[in-house]
């Protein structure tokens, strides 16, 4: 007899109903719950899966390089990055009629193509790639690395080469390795690449393997390094008239602290970036020697944590016992990693446009919008995941005895104060922000716009002025040429910063007003509400007033009947589920704000944002409706254009999103009737009745239906906005 899915759970495999399929999928990655799972096995499976993920990442990036080299226009694009659209890949679609072939044939390519809005062209150009052969070489190298990663994953599952649990739990060695080897040496290698390849290429000097050892990146070579005359490497930087990619106006400096942007490319100075990575490398290589391993130097993390007690004694035992708790909980470690990664991803979104590192990226408007939105959504999903695994930690891994009196138990002890304060903040933000918006809408509707409540963000303007923004004329610190801070900035550090912050063509410290003040608080409401739901879900995961024994029910349970007052919404999973909706709301408001402000800036029409962003109808009419008009005319009875695919995706995204509500607003009886009706029809229809339905149809559980609904809501939401964003921006700016 064939083994039924899932192999990892004999109990589920023998289930005669469709529950077998859904629960099998739901628990396929929950290794801890699988039959015969040992701690040793668990760690090895996760370790091997890391190599699998690395292989997928390298294969994906290899594919990007390969398709651009094969079907792109990289060599043509670098001759005129501001006017030639970069091609991602060709389109070979048998459904295309002549109008579609003509609409999608662009960028001097003989057939239909997709335009690249990922920024890879700018990235590859900045780091010194110049020909299709360079791209092919990179692609083949990454393919080799992907193969190596797959082999490593397989190898480490073999008994002879599989590490023991003690190896995985050697936190000091792992941290030293990650800090020094992964962060430190990779940063050093990257600064080396920038100094030896990218900076010379930006000055018209072609460096490859054939002349790598003979072409000095600096005229003095390593002599200043060994003599301690390091400042020599910062002398004679590229001039303000430097033409990127040529020797015209080029200097010889390789490590600088200029600040601001290259006047032509509007990106950070490559020599500043190289300096940054070298400094990071030194810091991390030193940091990788902090913890005690085989040698009798450095600290034990356990000792550090146990010593962390407040002298006043008012904070209990502080971090006592945390080492064992964290080191023995994969969920705690994953939660910390996801929280860090979420913050970093959001910072990438912010810095990619405000301090753009890649040449000519900021002039590619659609790519800027796509990269910001992409990274903010990813940050949102990662952050919610951090809290989900925090909740699982409290249910599965938290030991009350081992953590008595320390910071973890104290947080649990006063969770009601934390939750109620967060609740108060969200209520305050919600009522006041919505109140201001609605008041302004009423004033607009009643024909008295002068009665709107418009609040200038004076504190934020003061902070911008302190950093050198001149437009507000507040004359404070860097915005006052008579201050000591101003003098220091000109003589000691970042002389280009003030030009950068006051440059109208970049997005560093944009001018803000009442519309920004309101949307800032709307976003703050979203952030605090999402946090409230996630924090409450994690802190109540073990038990709440209504359900003190909640931890015995696990991470996701459907209902425990009306006896406790109805418990359908209080599992930790439900908190995660609700938080994702709020997260999507928040990222929506954030990206709406970023996009609308920038398209008005880029069009020289900033007054539209300033006037219309102070009331809700302004957002609906002048941002959403106005910018979707071209999109929904991508195809109509008279024909189609190159926005047609985005118009179709806009529709498709709405449909997926709306399908989510069918799963979210329904009772279990509805699903039982629906599934039985579907099976009945399936078994009585020619052709489909050839396939026998062996499992008894059982309705989705409440938790399952919510998951399916949430997935459709999220995917549809992202698809809809992606289509809107790319189409509305590319229609205006290419």
From Swiss-Prot:
Amino-acid positions noted as binding [4Fe-4S] cluster in the UniProt annotation, renumbered to this chain: 559, 568
Free-text comment on the cofactor: P700 is a chlorophyll a/chlorophyll a' dimer, A0 is one or more chlorophyll a, A1 is one or both phylloquinones and FX is a shared 4Fe-4S iron-sulfur center.
PROSITE patterns, alphabetized: PHOTOSYSTEM_I_PSAAB (PS00419)
GO biological process terms, semicolon-separated: photosynthesis
E.C. number(s) listed in UniProt: 1.97.1.12
A Gene Ontology term for the protein's cellular component: photosystem I
Main location group: plastid
Record Pfam families: PsaA_PsaB (PF00223)
Top-level taxon of origin: Eukaryota
Keywords recorded for this protein, A-Z: 4Fe-4S, Chlorophyll, Chloroplast, Chromophore, Electron transport, Iron, Iron-sulfur, Magnesium, Membrane, Metal-binding, Oxidoreductase, Photosynthesis, Photosystem I, Plastid, Thylakoid, Transmembrane, Transmembrane helix, Transport
Transmembrane segment boundaries: 46-69, 135-158, 175-199, 273-291, 330-353, 369-395, 417-439, 517-535, 575-596, 643-665, 707-727
Membrane topology value: Multi-pass membrane protein
Sites where the protein binds chlorophyll a B1: 654
EC supergroup of this enzyme: oxidoreductase
Enzymatic reactions: reduced [plastocyanin] + hnu + oxidized [2Fe-2S]-[ferredoxin] = oxidized [plastocyanin] + reduced [2Fe-2S]-[ferredoxin]
Residues that coordinate or bind chlorophyll a B3: 662, 670
Annotated compartments: Plastid, Chloroplast thylakoid membrane
Residue numbers binding phylloquinone: 671
MF GO annotations: 4 iron, 4 sulfur cluster binding; chlorophyll binding; electron transfer activity; magnesium ion binding; oxidoreductase activity
InterPro entries: PSI_PsaA/B, PSI_PsaA/B_CS, PSI_PsaA/B_sf, PSI_PsaB
Assembly, per entry: The PsaA/B heterodimer binds the P700 chlorophyll special pair and subsequent electron acceptors. PSI consists of a core antenna complex that captures photons, and an electron transfer chain that converts photonic excitation into a charge separation. The eukaryotic PSI reaction center is composed of at least 11 subunits.
Family: Belongs to the PsaA/PsaB family.
HAMAP family given in the database record: PSI_PsaB (MF_00482)
Role noted for this protein: PsaA and PsaB bind P700, the primary electron donor of photosystem I (PSI), as well as the electron acceptors A0, A1 and FX. PSI is a plastocyanin/cytochrome c6-ferredoxin oxidoreductase, converting photonic excitation into a charge separation, which transfers an electron from the donor P700 chlorophyll pair to the spectroscopically characterized acceptors A0, A1, FX, FA and FB in turn. Oxidized P700 is reduced on the lumenal side of the thylakoid membrane by plastocyanin or cytochrome c6.
Protein name, per record: Photosystem I P700 chlorophyll a apoprotein A2
Species lineage: Eukaryota, Discoba, Euglenozoa, Euglenida, Spirocuta
Gene (UniProt): psaB
